[in-house]
Amino acid sequence: MVLSDVDIKRYIEKGKIRISPDLPPEQFGSCSVDFRLGAEFNIFEYSRHAYIDLRDRGGIQDIMRPVTVPAGEPFVLQPHEFVLAITEEHLELDDDILGRLEGRSSLGRIGIIVHGTAGLFDPGWRGKATLELSNLGRMPVALYPGMRICSFTF
């Protein structure tokens, strides 16, 4: 069962779903909550290694370069580029609440994928959601910290 906006607000009031900062009314849909893009990105620098070795988790960190986008400036996602980002909001789920992250259709229609595979947030999860951003399109796209980037259902 997916919670309605009324149920989501009730669960927030009860503390079963905790989101900070508090959300303005326009971020609530009929059965979802919109989260905004944060200012922190991790850019993959593929030229540092011949391949990614999944058995070497430290090696993955070694090929990423953190970038913080200044307020009011865009992060330009190039065609076929893949980066990691985080949401502006911090989410905490009770031990009996599951969250699902979905990209916004307005972004999907221009080729922006918000998550590749990791859309499930287990009960008890806490933190800022990591976004797996990819531009499948043929043109660069300017993404602005603070813009609505994804929706959560519970």
What is each of the regions a protein language model found here?
Residues 1-154:
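DUTPase catalytic domain/fold
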